[in-house]
Amino acid sequence: MGSFLFLIVVIFLFSSSVNACDRCLHRSKAAYFSSASALSSGACAYGSMATSFFAGHIAAAIPSIYKDGAGCGACFQVRCKNPKLCSTKGTIVMITDLNKSNQTDLVLSSRAFRAMAKPIVGADKDLLKQGIVDIEYQRVPCDYGNKNMNVRVEEASKKPNYLEIKLLYQGGQTEVVSIDIAQVGSSPNWGYMTRSHGAVWVTDKVPTGAIQFRFVVTGGYDGKMIWSQSVLPSNWEAGKIYDAGVQITDIAQEGCDPCDAHIWN
């Protein structure tokens, strides 16, 4: 009986160590976009804004990272493994597109690809010549300093029956699972938005007047609601960007082995 209980405890501790992880370490390969025009046509629908995020250090990711658009805006630290050409720090990239290839987990912008190189003359150009490289990568929080998350009202929006928004500068290390929407007031009647594609959310039940949002994210293993009051004024306009008044800082736990622990150094 004692041995049986000991076995249960060992299994529990092992399972906990595997499942509870802030940052999972992944090993795969990465390529880069040879055409700069591809960076502005990513599946996340950031358009030409994509190249302005993280100084153009952006990437396309496989479906398990893209998550039908929920992974748009996620940040990853990635480094290549060639000891002659690659730095140990690597670079941080933001996900802006879907990578449908089964040869690589990530396809980086050429700027991000070169940033993985050692800071020695010619290393970045030699790295580009490799085309596809072995990498390690881990998810990290997106840090925008003191900047709040923004809400962009897309051009397809039309009062009073259709609202299409895109989330920009989304911080933290988690995903927005759902968005609720309501008119600003003492007793709001909350509706919901649907993810259309990428970072774009839509609703055909548009509240009148000023609009507030509730963003549901994962903090640890649990859901958490972030309430953003009075984001869109009553005279909101398509094509404009509005300050959400809040920022996401939560970290979602991942289930994996190994965690980054002391491996990334």
Curated annotation (Swiss-Prot):
Signal peptide extent: 1-20
Domain of life: Eukaryota
Subcellular location: Membrane
InterPro entries xref list: Expan_Lol_pI, Expansin/allergen_DPBB_dom, Expansin_CBD, Expansin_CBD_sf, RlpA-like_DPBB, RlpA-like_sf
SUPFAM superfamilies, sorted: Barwin-like endoglucanases, PHL pollen allergen
GO cellular component terms, semicolon-separated: extracellular region; Golgi apparatus; membrane; plant-type cell wall; plasmodesma; secretory vesicle
Example GO biological process: anatomical structure morphogenesis
Domain (Expansin-like EG45) ranges: 41-147
CDD domains, per database record: DPBB_EXLA_N
Segments forming domain Expansin-like CBD: 161-244
Pfam families: DPBB_1, Expansin_C
Entry membrane topology: Single-pass type I membrane protein
Coiled coil: none
Transmembrane segments: 42-62
Alphabetized UniProt keyword annotations: Glycoprotein, Membrane, Signal, Transmembrane, Transmembrane helix
Glycosylation sites: 99, 102
Xref: PROSITE patterns: EXPANSIN_CBD (PS50843), EXPANSIN_EG45 (PS50842)
Family to which the UniProt record says this protein belongs: Belongs to the expansin family. Expansin-like A subfamily.
UniProt cross-references to PANTHER family, sorted A to Z: EXPANSIN-B3, EXPANSIN-LIKE A1-RELATED
Name this protein carries in UniProt: Expansin-like A1
